[in-house]
Regions:
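Short, well-ordered loop/turn and helix-capping segments at boundaries between secondary-structure elements
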Residues: 6, 38, 42, 60, ...
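Short, charged alpha-helical motifs in flexible N/C-terminal segments and linkers
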Residues: 1, 99-164
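Short conserved micro-motifs at the rims of enzyme active sites and ligand-binding pockets
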Residues: 11-14, 44-47, 155-156
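Short, conserved micro-motifs composed of acidic
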Residues: 1-28
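Residues in well-ordered beta-strands of folded domains
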Residues: 1-3, 18, 33-36, 144
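Basic, alpha-helical interaction scaffolds
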Residues: 21-91
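Charged boundary/loop elements
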Residues: 85-100, 104
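Short intrinsically disordered coil segments
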Residues: 15-20, 47-52, 127, 160
Length: 164
């Protein structure tokens, strides 16, 4: 994949040959360690995949909602939906508000599943009902925790390499 932030899509390059003589395949999107990269280094592809993954899980939960108690719904969303949002949330630092609003909508849908709140319920009321922060606050808190751990020297090796 060649990265190019210019507006037109990059032309497919001539073949790139490795040291052992094999040709590399050109791809527009590539998943690396759970994060989707595209040739323009935008977060749109990653956010779309997150949105699809969360929607499919929430749909499954809604189809089987009669089988779950309130506590079970709360636990299921906490264990199946929230980790998707947490993994790779550093990408949200560079995402546009339009893309983040799409994740907010899915997050609100997950909260509505837990609380049985109608669609017209304001998002602030949803957060109060379930006792969770907004997605922005959640990501900001996680970001501050990463910075704090880095300062204490308890960051993962790939992050501590970049800290003083």
């Amino acid at each position: 994949m060649l990265f190019n932030r210019s507006l037109p899509a990059p032309a497919h390059p001539t073949s790139i040959t490795t040291l052992n003589g094999s040709n590399l395949e050109y791809v527009d999107n590539y998943k690396y360690l759970g994060v989707w990269l595209d040739c323009k280094l935008s977060s749109q592809t990653h956010i779309k995949h997150l949105q699809y993954k969360m929607k499919s899980r929430i749909s499954f939960l809604y189809r089987n909602k009669a089988s779950f108690t309130h506590a079970a719904k709360h636990t299921l969303v906490k264990l199946t939906i929230l980790p998707i949002l947490d993994f790779g949330d550093v990408i949200s630092k560079i995402a546009s508000n339009t893309l983040l609003n799409k994740l907010d909508a899915v997050y609100h849908s997950a909260i509505r599943f837990v609380t049985k709140a109608p669609y017209t319920t304001h998002h602030c009321d949803l957060y109060t009902l379930v006792g969770w922060p907004s997605l922005h606050t959640h990501h900001q808190t996680h970001w501050f925790q990463v910075i704090y751990k880095s300062l204490l020297g308890k960051a993962p090796p790939y992050l501590s390499y970049w800290s003083p």
